[in-house]
C-alpha cells in the first residue's frame, strides 16, 4: 500500500494491518536505537525547517498543535520521513480523562507510530501513563530494549502528580528495560536509567525569543 493510496477516515482504520498487543489491540512498535544525540524540535516548528535530515521531531506540546498528523496521516508521514528521527505523537493521558479516552489516545499514538515505521520513518516511542490502573494497558505496544522518550513537563507541580510520574517511570524501566531514555523536562532524583536530558520546549522557546530580540 502506497502513501498515495491511504484515504483519510475518522479513525484511520485503513492505515494497514499491524501486529497487535494487549487486550485492546494496540499496534506494536519496533525497537529503535539512536546512539547519537541530536537536536529535537517541536512539531509545530518543523514545517519551516530546511535542514531536516539532522533534526528530530517531538510532540511534547499541546494536542491541538499536532492533530493534523492524525487528520491527514499520509501527507505528514511523507513529510516526517525527511527528518533524522521522529517521536510518536504524545496524545494526552491525563489522569482525569475517562479511561475510554485514555485508551483511545494510546491506541492512536501507536496506530500512527506503526504506520510511520512501516513507511521508513525512524520512529521513537514516546511513553506515557496516567495512574497505576493505566499500567494494565499503557505499555502495550511499546518495544523492549529500545530508545524511548518521556516528558515530565507539567507533572512536578504538586506532590501527587510528581508521585504518579515517578511511579510510572519506574514501572516503565521494569517492563521495557529501555537502552536510552530521551528525557524532556526536570529529572527527579528518583528516576534512573540511561537518561539523555533535554530542556522542555518552553525553555527553548524562551531562549529563541531572547535571541531574536537581541538580534533586532
Task: Give a label for each model feature.
Residues 1-31, 194-216:
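C-terminal accessory extensions appended to soluble enzyme cores
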Residues 10-77, 97, 175:
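Non-catalytic, usually N-terminal nucleic-acid engagement modules in DNA/RNA processing proteins
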Residues 44-50, 56-57, 69-213:
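Eukaryote-skewed repeat-based solenoidal scaffolds used as protein-protein interaction platforms
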Amino acid at each position: 500500500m502506497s502513501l498515495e493510496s491511504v484515504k483519510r477516515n475518522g479513525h484511520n482504520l485503513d492505515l494497514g494491518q499491524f501486529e497487535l498487543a494487549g487486550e485492546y489491540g494496540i499496534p506494536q512498535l519496533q525497537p529503535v536505537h539512536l546512539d547519537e544525540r541530536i537536536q529535537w524540535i517541536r512539531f509545530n516548528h518543523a514545517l519551516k525547517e530546511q535542514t531536516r535530515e539532522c533534526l528530530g521531531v517531538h510532540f511534547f506540546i499541546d494536542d491541538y498543535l499536532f492533530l493534523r498528523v492524525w487528520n491527514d496521516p499520509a501527507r505528514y508521514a511523507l513529510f516526517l520521513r525527511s527528518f533524522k528521527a521522529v517521536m510518536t505523537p504524545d496524545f494526552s493521558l491525563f489522569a482525569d480523562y475517562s479511561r475510554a479516552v485514555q485508551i483511545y489516545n494510546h491506541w492512536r499514538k501507536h496506530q500512527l507510530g506503526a504506520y510511520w515505521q512501516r513507511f521508513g520513518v525512524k520512529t521513537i516511542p514516546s511513553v506515557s501513563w496516567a495512574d497505576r490502573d493505566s499500567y494494565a494497558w499503557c505499555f502495550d505496544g511499546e518495544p523492549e530494549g529500545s530508545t524511548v522518550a518521556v516528558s515530565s513537563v507539567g507533572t512536578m507541580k504538586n506532590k501527587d502528580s510528581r508521585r504518579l510520574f515517578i511511579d510510572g517511570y519506574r514501572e516503565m524501566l521494569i517492563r521495557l528495560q529501555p537502552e536510552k531514555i530521551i528525557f524532556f523536562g526536570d529529572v527527579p532524583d528518583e528516576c534512573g536509567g540511561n537518561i539523555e536530558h533535554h530542556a522542555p520546549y518552553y525553555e527553548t522557546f524562551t531562549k529563541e525569543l531572547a535571541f531574536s530580540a537581541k538580534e533586532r
